[in-house]
Regions:
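Short gly/ser-rich anion-binding loops that grip negatively charged ligand groups
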Residues: 53-60, 81-92, 113-117, 130
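N-terminal glycine-rich anion-binding loop in soluble enzyme alpha/beta folds
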Residues: 3-65, 69
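Broad hydrophobic/π-residue packing in well-ordered secondary structure
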Residues: 32, 37, 43-45, 63, ...
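Mixed-charge interfacial surface used for oligomerization/domain docking
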Residues: 4, 10-24, 29-31, 78, ...
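N-terminal glycine-rich phosphate/adenylate-binding segment common to multiple enzyme folds
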Residues: 62-102
Length: 280
């Protein structure tokens, strides 16, 4: 058997990748009125401009069910669970409670990805690749932690109000992002969203996003992910510029944000994740 990797649906990994590497996925929830929709399981149409649409983490019971299934599938080799930043979601805390309830602290290792979207997904992918090569529980855990701590994430949003309302961004940062600039460039720092810099035009914002990603990538090759919501053309342009400026690029993924993150980021959001050294 082999170590099994678990992540949550906000990680945004393609279904084909999840299936190929045997990654287990815990669905998070989008709340539309009185209806709770499981991300990635049930189809959903969302008005991302609505103030009434919210999200919620999986419960400890839901997490425990997935962890127990993964542990059985591992044949006792263990589970590494890589989840969205605990600063942005209650998912990691639900996972910790599930592990306590299972009394399985030695067999189920939790990793705070310090990120969201593919900033969670690529560390989970790094762990799953290591598991597929026969890695031990410690080695698979270390692969996830290494990728997560190296990762650098930069996000452009049209509005910061949704992030502030959901508690994902400070009131001060939200003010500077919404009142004084056209396109705020945010970054994840130790799992928290912070305002990195300000751009008054869309073109300057894209240029600064690319520059930040290139600087973070370094010269030794990197894994890069570009994510967006309703900004496919801009995402492809940014991806093309990154290909040109990072000739040693090891991996490049372009994908759309899933519903849980999209609720908070809003239409037009565009993000770049960089993992220096890659996530093999």
């Amino acid at each position: 058997m082999a170590v099994v990797v678990v992540t949550d649906s906000s990680a945004g990994l393609p279904t084909a990748t999840v299936d190929e590497l045997g990654i287990a996925v815990v669905p998070l929830h989008v709340l539309v009125g009185d209806r709770a929709i499981r991300e990635g399981v049930e189809p959903v149409e969302i008005d991302y401009t609505s103030d009434t649409v919210t999200t919620s983490a999986a419960s400890p019971g839901e997490m425990r069910e997935i962890y127990e299934q993964a542990l059985r599938r591992s044949g006792g080799d263990g589970v590494v669970a890589v989840h969205v930043s605990r600063q942005l979601s209650g998912t990691w805390e639900s996972g910790r409670q599930a592990v306590r309830d299972m009394d399985a602290g030695r067999q189920v290792r939790l990793v705070d990805s310090l990120g969201a979207g593919l900033a969670t997904g690529l560390p989970a992918l790094a762990a799953a690749r290591r598991a597929a090569r026969g890695g031990t529980l410690d080695e698979v855990y270390d692969a996830a932690v290494t990728a997560a701590t190296r990762a650098r994430t930069f996000i452009l949003v049209n509005r910061t109000e949704q992030l502030r309302r959901g508690g994902r961004l400070s009131t001060a940062a939200s003010f500077f992002g919404s009142e004084l600039v056209t396109r705020p460039l945010l970054q994840l720092v130790e799992g928290k969203l912070e305002l990195r810099e300000k751009a008054r035009t869309r073109s300057k914002a894209y240029a600064r996003l690319v520059a930040a990603a290139v600087e973070a990538a370094g010269a030794d090759g990197a894994a890069v992910a570009v994510q967006h919501l309703g900004a496919a053309e801009a995402a492809e342009i940014v991806a093309g510029q990154l290909r040109e400026r990072l000739p040693e690029l090891k991996e490049l993924v372009v994908a759309e944000f899933g519903p849980v993150l999209a609720v908070h980021l809003g239409v037009g959001a565009l993000g770049v994740l960089v993992i220096p050294g890659g996530c093999d």
